[in-house]
């Protein structure tokens, strides 16, 4: 195989060097679990919010003939952050984002989790001008653990807020782990980067395990132990 600059790339030799590089190997492992955690967190946000905030019970109390406005007003009274989101949607004319079902109400928290993820990406970018990236990474990882405990043990809005907080903590993870893992690889960077990207397979593995835990325990909260 030939690289971009015409040099010959020996795949087997490169692979052996990568395997012997502990920093790289642990980078791939970290990325595997990082991506797995991201998708596992986001995949169950809707169901988690539905259970913790009892959207099914709230809408059932309104009856089948409830109007769309009645549904939104009932959901607005459950939790203040979502209420502000609904107010914003109405202000900007984004009525399609207003929930009409319990699942759509849960999806509100999924949307807000993604918004928080994006906001925190920019916040972390600014922070890296003043704080070393690895320190921010460690801090966010520890904070994510605390939020995860809150997600598993918390009740109602508190648990939902903790779950959304995990999303914010994950914003810096992928690019930072990727950069640290490829540090010092030199000519092995291209192949090393491909394996780092392949670590996204963690999403397929951890979400399956999380689903099994949820089914076996009958608790979506317990599933976040994964």
Indicate where each model-derived feature is located:
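Juxtamembrane intracellular "pre-TM" segments in multi-pass secondary transporters
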Residues: 3-27, 67
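Extracytoplasmic gate region of multi-pass secondary transporters
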Residues: 20-61, 73-109
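Transmembrane alpha-helical segments of major facilitator superfamily
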Residues: 106-117, 198-199
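Helix-to-loop junctions at the C-terminal end of transmembrane segments
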Residues: 119-132
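Structural signature of the two symmetry-related core transmembrane helices
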Residues: 135-149
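Helix-loop junctions at membrane interfaces in 12-TM secondary transporters
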Residues: 152-162
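Intracellular juxtamembrane helix-capping segments at the cytosolic ends
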Residues: 171-186
């Amino acid at each position: 195989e030939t690289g971009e600059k015409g040099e010959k790339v020996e795949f087997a030799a490169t692979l052996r060097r990568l395997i012997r590089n502990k920093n790289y190997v642990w980078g791939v492992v970290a990325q595997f679990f990082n991506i797995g955690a991201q998708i596992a967190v986001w995949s169950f946000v809707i169901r988690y919010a539905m259970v913790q905030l009892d959207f099914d019970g709230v809408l059932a109390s309104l009856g089948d003939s409830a109007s769309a406005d009645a549904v939104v007003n009932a959901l607005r009274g459950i939790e203040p952050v979502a209420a502000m989101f609904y107010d914003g949607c109405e202000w900007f004319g984004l009525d399609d984002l207003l929930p009409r079902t319990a699942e759509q109400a849960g999806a509100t928290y999924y949307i807000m989790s993604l918004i928080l993820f994006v906001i925190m990406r920019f916040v972390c970018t600014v922070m890296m001008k003043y704080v070393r990236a690895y320190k921010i990474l460690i801090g966010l990882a520890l904070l994510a653990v605390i939020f995860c405990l809150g997600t598993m043990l918390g009740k109602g809005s508190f648990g939902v807020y903790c779950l959304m907080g995990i999303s914010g903590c994950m914003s810096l993870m992928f690019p930072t782990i990727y950069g640290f893992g490829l540090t010092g690889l030199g000519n092995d960077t291209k192949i090393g980067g491909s394996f780092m990207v392949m670590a996204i397979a963690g999403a397929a593995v951890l979400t399956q395990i999380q689903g099994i835990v949820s089914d076996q325990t009958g608790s979506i909260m317990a599933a976040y132990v994964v």
